[in-house]
């Protein structure tokens, strides 16, 4: 009789654990999804990029939207989606922002004054330019810093903002429409 009581207690404990774990995982997943939707609605692009790129969770939806990301195996190996590529007027490569970051980095190559120019931007959540860097290959093939006019920088920033805003709209539509 004592053995049956002990087995019954273990059965209750195991059943409880098997019930609680899926409920906890469902709650956590729901909470994360809610946080992402809130970030979209606040237009906090840094937070949205962090949640989308922090793991392979949204990889299939990003691919479905037509964006280029590494294979699932590479994402699992790196722990993040790096890079997220947006092909448009310029081919953006976005680095994943850290949790609670205030900015994010992106890179692309474009033509400035008939020379191939490598561009790095650091943008905040409102897509304001925090930092920019430009480089070009010199005649001997070494990359060196370059400068561009303010109007050219403004033109490039406008293109980048349009591409990122388009990405945000597409992802919101795919995830929540």
Per-segment meaning from a language model:
Residues 9-25:
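Hydrophobic membrane-insertion alpha-helices, especially the h-region
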Residues 24-98:
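N-terminal export/targeting and maturation segments
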Residues 10, 41, 45, 53-58, ...:
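Generic surface-pattern signal
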Residues 85-177:
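Extracytoplasmic electrostatic interaction patches
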């Amino acid at each position: 009789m004592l053995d049956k009581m002990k087995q019954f207690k273990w059965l209750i404990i195991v059943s409880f654990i098997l019930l609680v774990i899926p409920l906890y995982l469902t709650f956590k997943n729901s909470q994360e999804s809610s946080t992402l939707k809130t970030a979209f609605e606040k237009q906090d692009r840094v937070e949205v990029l962090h949640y989308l790129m922090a793991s392979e969770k949204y990889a299939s939806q990003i691919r479905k939207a037509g964006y280029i990301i590494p294979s699932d195996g590479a994402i699992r190996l790196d722990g993040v989606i790096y890079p997220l590529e947006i092909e448009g007027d310029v081919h953006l490569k976005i680095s994943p922002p850290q949790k609670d970051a205030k900015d994010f980095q992106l890179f692309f190559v474009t033509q400035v004054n008939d020379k191939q120019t490598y561009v790095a931007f650091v943008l905040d959540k409102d897509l304001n330019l925090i930092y920019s860097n430009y480089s070009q290959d010199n005649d001997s093939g070494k990359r060196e810093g370059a400068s561009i006019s303010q109007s050219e920088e403004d033109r490039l920033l406008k293109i980048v903002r349009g591409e990122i805003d388009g990405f945000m709209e597409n992802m919101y539509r795919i995830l929540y429409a």
